[in-house]
Amino acid sequence: MEPSPEMKRKRRTKDKRVLRKALQCICFKKRIVVLFMEWNKTYHRRKICIIFFSVVLMSMVLCGRLVYLMLFEGKYYETQAKDLQQRERKIKAARGKILDRNGVVLADNKSVCTISVIHNQIKEPEAVIAMLVKELGIPEEKIRRRVEKYSSLEKIKSNVDKETGNRILAYGYAGVKVDEDYKRNYPYDTLASKVLGFTGGDNQGIIGLESVYDKYLEGTDGLILTTTDARGVEVDNIGEERKEPVAGNNLRTSLDANIQMFAMQAANKAYIQKEADSVSIIVMNPSDGAVMAMVDYPEFHLNEPFQLIEEYKEYEGTKKEQEYCNRMWRNQCINDTYEPGSTFKVITAAAALEEGVVSLEDRFHCPGYIVVEDRRIRCHKTTGHGAESFVEGIENSCNPVFINVGLRIGADHFYDYFEQFGLLHKTGIDLPGEASTIMHKREKIGLVELATISFGQSFQITPIQLATTVSSIINGGNRVTPHVGMQVENGDKKVIKTFDFPVQEGICREETSEKMRFLLEKVVSEGGGNKAYIEGYEIGGKTATSQTLPRSAHKYISSFLGFAPADDPKVLVLVIIRNPSGIYYGGTIAAPVAKEIFENILPYLELEQ
């Protein structure tokens, strides 16, 4: 059926409306495209401008940086570049000498070589390996590993003697370096080994004076600078630059090489004759604490410090080797404590005189023992000394007399004297590893403990502590600091530094000091220390025999402490013999050792009879 005219009209109107909308849409899209194209042109222009100005700015910054580096940092980067082309080798500085008080050299240096290789410079590796094996006696495998190792400088061996170093140098092999070096040398080898100490592979002090005064003894290493190409090969036509080493300063000590030898000979003799475990001897000036000799026998070999002494040879190559090296290096004069026994009666007597609880005329009775609380404490003379004065009690080293004196002082006051005399603190000696006093706490000291303390048992001190405290009592009452270092000198003997050691005045009265010198002279001239007596000399002293712990082991320590001249002491000697065989009484075996030392050193020191 054909549509009516009205329907046709409506359809045409609708089609026109659709067409109009389509045209409007097309026009809108066209407009958008036109706008986008206009915006795109603006965007690209802006982008180009930003990129352009960024490039210009970056160029200006880079140019400015280059100008800055060239003008202001040029030398720095030139040095950096040069460093990349330079190889440095150290020139070891000579270590300072250690001298005795008279300038005798106790430690110096031996000129040696260090052999190294530079892998990329070696042209004949097999010949180099064969030569190094032959000259150095090192297994081929070890040499080969180091020669073939890619490194700038590989050390083969240090401390090579000069003759061997010169022979290696004479081969003329490229890549083999022979550098000058120093090895510590001890002219007397075992003399004062535990005092001097030794150095390690880096030439730094390990123990003893070498360790304590290392900062003065060590020098400043020098350098050898060589120029290399891109492959690390040294350029032949450019000479080496050298920065010369600066040697260390010398240390002058209070030791006297001759007195040290006298003491060491006496210790060696006692060690052999008495089949002892060890012998320690200290010789010092009681007026200022200067140590003139210190022996702890057996000593070790300073030039071969890791070689065990004969007594420890069985431990070589075992797991205990290092343990016995440490034992061998240990200085029992300062590192170990012991019960001083009757030598401590010097301190008990001084405390009693200071406290005013005893006089030289006081009378005592010794039946051979004394009962304190539930303990029966015997005298070394089991039959007893009978009636005796305080002076005779010291001469006889009578335990009951000193127990009575200790009880008079009282635990509290006795502890105060430990503090006053400096016994509860380290002496401050300039040697490493000083041990502390082992003592009861004040509140733990009962009557039995007080009784045993009064004659030198139930507590422990070091030998240097005993020597220092007695020195302070007999020198007028000044607590000195024992020391070995005296001053630092340069190679021209100019003094750079003098060491001052503290002195505490007034630890006891001059009157007490005078009485103690009188009492101790009587011990040697008339009492138990008579085996140290030397005709023509006034010598004061005190003997001791003490047991080690545990008591059940029945091991003893025999000792004697003496000084001369008795009225004005200039030298003090302490002798300690550990676990002697046979007779072990201090007056019998330690006093004669001290006498032998006095017989040698009193004339040597020109002390008048």
Residue ranges and their predicted role:
Residues 2-8, 29-35, 107, 229-240, ...:
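Beta-lactam-recognizing serine transpeptidase/beta-lactamase-like catalytic domain environment
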Residues 2-311, 337, 359, 412-424, ...:
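Periplasmic/cell-envelope proteins involved in peptidoglycan metabolism and beta-lactam response
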